[in-house]
Amino acid sequence: MARAQALVLALTFQLCAPETETPAAGCTFEEASDPAVPCEYSQAQYDDFQWEQVRIHPGTRAPADLPHGSYLMVNTSQHAPGQRAHVIFQSLSENDTHCVQFSYFLYSRDGHSPGTLGVYVRVNGGPLGSAVWNMTGSHGRQWHQAELAVSTFWPNEYQVLFEALISPDRRGYMGLDDILLLSYPCAKAPHFSRLGDVEVNAGQNASFQCMAAGRAAEAERFLLQRQSGALVPAAGVRHISHRRFLATFPLAAVSRAEQDLYRCVSQAPRGAGVSNFAELIVKEPPTPIAPPQLLRAGPTYLIIQLNTNSIIGDGPIVRKEIEYRMARGPWAEVHAVSLQTYKLWHLDPDTEYEISVLLTRPGDGGTGRPGPPLISRTKCAEPMRAPKGLAFAEIQARQLTLQWEPLGYNVTRCHTYTVSLCYHYTLGSSHNQTIRECVKTEQGVSRYTIKNLLPYRNVHVRLVLTNPEGRKEGKEVTFQTDEDVPSGIAAESLTFTPLEDMIFLKWEEPQEPNGLITQYEISYQSIESSDPAVNVPGPRRTISKLRNETYHVFSNLHPGTTYLFSVRARTGKGFGQAALTEITTNISAPSFDYADMPSPLGESENTITVLLRPAQGRGAPISVYQVIVEEERARRLRREPGGQDCFPVPLTFEAALARGLVHYFGAELAASSLPEAMPFTVGDNQTYRGFWNPPLEPRKAYLIYFQAASHLKGETRLNCIRIARKAACKESKRPLEVSQRSEEMGLILGICAGGLAVLILLLGAIIVIIRKGRDHYAYSYYPKPVNMTKATVNYRQEKTHMMSAVDRSFTDQSTLQEDERLGLSFMDTHGYSTRGDQRSGGVTEASSLLGGSPRRPCGRKGSPYHTGQLHPAVRVADLLQHINQMKTAEGYGFKQEYESFFEGWDATKKKDKVKGSRQEPMPAYDRHRVKLHPMLGDPNADYINANYIDGYHRSNHFIATQGPKPEMVYDFWRMVWQEHCSSIVMITKLVEVGRVKCSRYWPEDSDTYGDIKIMLVKTETLAEYVVRTFALERRGYSARHEVRQFHFTAWPEHGVPYHATGLLAFIRRVKASTPPDAGPIVIHCSAGTGRTGCYIVLDVMLDMAECEGVVDIYNCVKTLCSRRVNMIQTEEQYIFIHDAILEACLCGETTIPVSEFKATYKEMIRIDPQSNSSQLREEFQTLNSVTPPLDVEECSIALLPRNRDKNRSMDVLPPDRCLPFLISTDGDSNNYINAALTDSYTRSAAFIVTLHPLQSTTPDFWRLVYDYGCTSIVMLNQLNQSNSAWPCLQYWPEPGRQQYGLMEVEFMSGTADEDLVARVFRVQNISRLQEGHLLVRHFQFLRWSAYRDTPDSKKAFLHLLAEVDKWQAESGDGRTIVHCLNGGGRSGTFCACATVLEMIRCHNLVDVFFAAKTLRNYKPNMVETMDQYHFCYDVALEYLEGLESR
């Protein structure tokens, strides 16, 4: 028994041994507590009251309800309900499993609850949360023990707080004692395993799994406690084993607001288990902040960029999707996307879509809400077909009502479309003007009435369906309007020829026949007459004429009578308005009532008495009678009675005697004095109305004439008749009888002859009338002959000195108000005048800024090149200042302006059309793309990479395209044929920088491309461009087209031309050579962009400057880029356009036709008395002002130290860009020589201008001759010219041969005259004898004195030019070396004159300014002085006068 008791005691000791271990920390509240166990606690500062530490021992006065011992106590009766007090245990941070044990005392004598004792566990100083354990009620007058199994470990720390909460009963005591930290597991509370974080997407269910070890009491509750204090009960507890169980806590559809820290808590009366805090991580599914971006829209596709860089929500993003739907549609589709851009296919044209982006992160429910939608509309697609079923509904004379099939969306493929009714008809006038109009009908309407038409016209109508992406034209249908009454015959078309009793009347068809003219009706009647015998108004007579008879001869009319004529035309609808005119017949000569010559009533030696009978007036009364006496002489032809040779000039006897005439007026009688026949004695020595009737001389024979005159309205008609003959008295009787018989026979013959003459005259008059009628029928209008002196119309404009003009423009422009500047045309604003304009007394400002051909009318129809507000047009007068500001501006200059073209720029490419594009093609915008006529079997045959470009006030004036590749040559010629193009502009070489830029699309002679045959007709080669003329024929067509290709070859392989002179001349040549009625001008370079755009901008701006006085380069380029992508490719090109326009405005058009040169030149050299200057001088000053000096950087090679000795003067150096580098190597000598390559008119680099060789450079000079194949040397200075500082030594052998370095020069022959010494040399390279020799002719000009700016003789200089030209033609057109002392003024004068003569021979033009400017582009010292410039004009004049004299 004893052993059994001992064994029980031993087991009891072992079981209880852990409980007697020393705690790691704690508070027993005893005075003699173990110092090894520190007691650290505190009470909250802001509690409602404080716990009271009491020590009650036996014998201590204390309430009987309290147990003995030292502990913390709360007397609840002393505090108000709801008041709280806390005891805060020290912070704990344990590494291993431990247990917090405490004792508590809750007692109320009446059994009511004194309050609630709660225990809180605060982790890392966080919020207090909810109590993990609490106890209420009265539990007897004894201590109870509870445990806390806290699973929070280092590095985290936690605090245990004990809270006393006063109950409403307020009776009893609450005590707390022995708060101990034990280093072993709790026996009464389970320990939780580590609780892990839970991550879930918002809106999804979450679940915490709490695993606990220990024994769970039946009454034990498991809770999920949120750090903020909320509690979630366990959905279920599952026992894994007898000491392990699992509590599950589901959270349904969590949101971001529920993201917090959570821990598991088990609660039982004997203690609580508390896990670590785990985080519930709620991820918000991602949603884009911004809608997707539209990159490009097509008719059936949208290309978008997802734009997902900024999102709302959490990543990572594992999937991207596009959700799209019609804006008004019920359906939606979702497509997965793997790239940042996505193309939505198979969309409907012109339809609005909502497009959103869906983003998905990992986990269920990871797909976020759709992002903000992009609402975008697809482009319209090209219409499926043109409208069909065009037919008339009603036809009237002046209007047509047409109808067609209604259109649906499946045809229009766009909600925004227009149906245009395009029609045209001819006016039918002599000009055959065609009226063309397109009328837009209202959308949805399929009926339209065309009004204000002309009757009986063929109206050609076609329907055009247009939407923003294209157009479809229907077949042309012809309708004819109904007839109407014709318009009135134009009164001015009535032409007539009045005679005495006839009128020839001619008229023209009405300007508006309004149908088929069936007849003409002419009515006439007399309305006034000066002949009293004529009854007025007379009866009205009417005649009708056939439709092809537009004239009539009215006969049997009364002389001197006015007739009213009315002419009107008739169609099937009736008569039109009549044209009225009054025509007066001519008065006729009076008529006499003499059947034959009467016998005299009496006769004496000095008198003869005749019978005067009154005459009858015809159309006018008789005004006066006159008796004329004529001495009969044998030599005089006899006057026949009734002849027209009357006596219109009254002549007295004295006047006739003084003038030696044989006739005189013997009497003048008033008409009223001869009412009836009466005798009159000739020679009665009386005076009748101022005319003396002297006695007749007996020994003379006389002829007596009686003349009647009628005067009316300034018109006089005479008739005279011989009424008697008086013979000389000296004749015997017999001869007298014979004479009298002869006289009688003569009288009879005279009467017959007179009658015959009258008959012939009448027949002649009729023939003349008929011929006039025919002529009038053939030609509708005869201008009256006017003596005109043709004024000299000059082709060029006056120019003043550029700098002074520009300076004036800067000061004058401020006085011109804005509305004035906009309202005035360029010519008005800038005082445009041409050379030879006599109305202009001086030169104007504008004349220095812009020259040109005589001002052409500038249309004001809508131009596509509109001036912008942010970039307004620049006045020509302000252009120089504007360019200088843009080049020197620091904030906003050409760079920024050029870059602004590409802001928001979106290049479009035509898909599936690779055939006509280059490797990196510039795409053609569909809206302005040239569409070829379709071909059978090839659906893509309508495509060519070409765009229509508007000109200045001329739509689709250009076609910009790329240089044809081999496979698109046929399409290129198809386009030229289809568009009726007459000009092709090519601005590229076939190969540049070793790359093929364009295929040779034209034949050497003749070739066929598809069904088009191209024949090269002519090639004209000039220095900077080539003009080729082709003839085009196409199978199935009878027409033959002529096309010119203008090939500009001077554009450098890199950058832009150094000067714009040649390009401007090229543009003018193209403009002048292109017929006004031709189709578009085709322009191409390689890609059809940069150079092509430069050309078009220059062409348009030159016209704008001429017509409006302003240039708007920025908006012009902007408009071009809207037609074709990237039309100006570089900033350098953009600046070049400005410089070129400035040069054009400053220099102007200076070409003079040969036919006008003499008069123009005379005007140019005339000194203006106001300015004391001439136009020629002003032109030379302009030349100086536009010749920039060379910069040091431009002459870097000439300035190298090793080359300084090769320059005669450091002031005259050649620029690097035109140096002829020597090819032949000669020891240590380098390849530099002071020389420059320059162009002639027809050949590039035709001249090499250099200085007279120095002694050290003579070998280099002959190397230059040989290396560049120079067959002519022109020497314009004299040997030993100037002083010893400028030696001009002989550099050739004469005679014999001499070696200069590698070159051997041999004198072959020579000729000389007073003007010129010509030598022939043979030059060869002794190091390369196999190359053969070069024959060179040396021309030494002798007629240019040392100190003169110009040659002594123009004729001698022309002789030099002719000899050089002749030799060049014979020797195969080698280069010409021209030298003078310094390679400047004299050499430039020679080259300029040679260039001008080439112009005359090639194109009958003279342009000295162009020749000099071109030369100065290479060397600024060419044509140095005003005298030399003047001399060039003199040489041209001398040459032309020589041509005229041949």
Curated annotation (Swiss-Prot):
<comment type="subunit">
    <text>Forms homooligomeric complexes which mediate cell homotypic adhesion. Interacts (via the cytoplasmic juxtamembrane domain) with CTNNB1; may mediate interaction with the cadherin/catenin adhesion complex. Interacts with KIT. May interact with AP3B1.</text>
</comment>
<dbReference type="Pfam" id="PF00102">
    <property type="entry name" value="Y_phosphatase"/>
</dbReference>
<dbReference type="GO" id="GO:0034394">
    <property type="term" value="P:protein localization to cell surface"/>
</dbReference>
<feature type="modified residue" description="Phosphoserine">
    <location>
        <position position="848"/>
    </location>
</feature>
<feature type="region of interest" description="Disordered">
    <location>
        <begin position="833"/>
        <end position="861"/>
    </location>
</feature>
<dbReference type="InterPro" id="IPR051622">
    <property type="entry name" value="R-tyr_protein_phosphatases"/>
</dbReference>
<dbReference type="InterPro" id="IPR013783">
    <property type="entry name" value="Ig-like_fold"/>
</dbReference>
<keyword id="KW-0221">Differentiation</keyword>
<feature type="transmembrane region" description="Helical">
    <location>
        <begin position="750"/>
        <end position="770"/>
    </location>
</feature>
<dbReference type="GO" id="GO:0005001">
    <property type="term" value="F:transmembrane receptor protein tyrosine phosphatase activity"/>
</dbReference>
<keyword id="KW-1015">Disulfide bond</keyword>
<feature type="domain" description="Ig-like C2-type">
    <location>
        <begin position="190"/>
        <end position="275"/>
    </location>
</feature>
<dbReference type="InterPro" id="IPR029021">
    <property type="entry name" value="Prot-tyrosine_phosphatase-like"/>
</dbReference>
<dbReference type="GO" id="GO:0004725">
    <property type="term" value="F:protein tyrosine phosphatase activity"/>
</dbReference>
<dbReference type="InterPro" id="IPR000387">
    <property type="entry name" value="Tyr_Pase_dom"/>
</dbReference>
<dbReference type="Pfam" id="PF00629">
    <property type="entry name" value="MAM"/>
</dbReference>
<feature type="domain" description="Tyrosine-protein phosphatase 2">
    <location>
        <begin position="1176"/>
        <end position="1439"/>
    </location>
</feature>
<dbReference type="GO" id="GO:0008013">
    <property type="term" value="F:beta-catenin binding"/>
</dbReference>
<keyword id="KW-0732">Signal</keyword>
<keyword id="KW-0325">Glycoprotein</keyword>
<feature type="glycosylation site" description="N-linked (GlcNAc...) asparagine">
    <location>
        <position position="410"/>
    </location>
</feature>
<feature type="domain" description="Fibronectin type-III 1">
    <location>
        <begin position="288"/>
        <end position="383"/>
    </location>
</feature>
<feature type="domain" description="Fibronectin type-III 4">
    <location>
        <begin position="592"/>
        <end position="674"/>
    </location>
</feature>
<keyword id="KW-0130">Cell adhesion</keyword>
<dbReference type="InterPro" id="IPR000242">
    <property type="entry name" value="PTP_cat"/>
</dbReference>
<dbReference type="InterPro" id="IPR000998">
    <property type="entry name" value="MAM_dom"/>
</dbReference>
<dbReference type="GO" id="GO:0034109">
    <property type="term" value="P:homotypic cell-cell adhesion"/>
</dbReference>
<keyword id="KW-0677">Repeat</keyword>
<dbReference type="InterPro" id="IPR016130">
    <property type="entry name" value="Tyr_Pase_AS"/>
</dbReference>
<dbReference type="GO" id="GO:0030336">
    <property type="term" value="P:negative regulation of cell migration"/>
</dbReference>
<feature type="binding site">
    <location>
        <begin position="1085"/>
        <end position="1091"/>
    </location>
    <ligand>
        <name>substrate</name>
    </ligand>
</feature>
<feature type="region of interest" description="Mediates interaction with CTNNB1">
    <location>
        <begin position="771"/>
        <end position="887"/>
    </location>
</feature>
<dbReference type="GO" id="GO:0031175">
    <property type="term" value="P:neuron projection development"/>
</dbReference>
<feature type="glycosylation site" description="N-linked (GlcNAc...) asparagine">
    <location>
        <position position="75"/>
    </location>
</feature>
<dbReference type="GO" id="GO:0008285">
    <property type="term" value="P:negative regulation of cell population proliferation"/>
</dbReference>
<feature type="domain" description="MAM">
    <location>
        <begin position="25"/>
        <end position="188"/>
    </location>
</feature>
<dbReference type="InterPro" id="IPR036179">
    <property type="entry name" value="Ig-like_dom_sf"/>
</dbReference>
<keyword id="KW-0904">Protein phosphatase</keyword>
<feature type="topological domain" description="Extracellular">
    <location>
        <begin position="19"/>
        <end position="749"/>
    </location>
</feature>
<keyword id="KW-0393">Immunoglobulin domain</keyword>
<feature type="modified residue" description="Phosphoserine">
    <location>
        <position position="853"/>
    </location>
</feature>
<feature type="active site" description="Phosphocysteine intermediate">
    <location>
        <position position="1380"/>
    </location>
</feature>
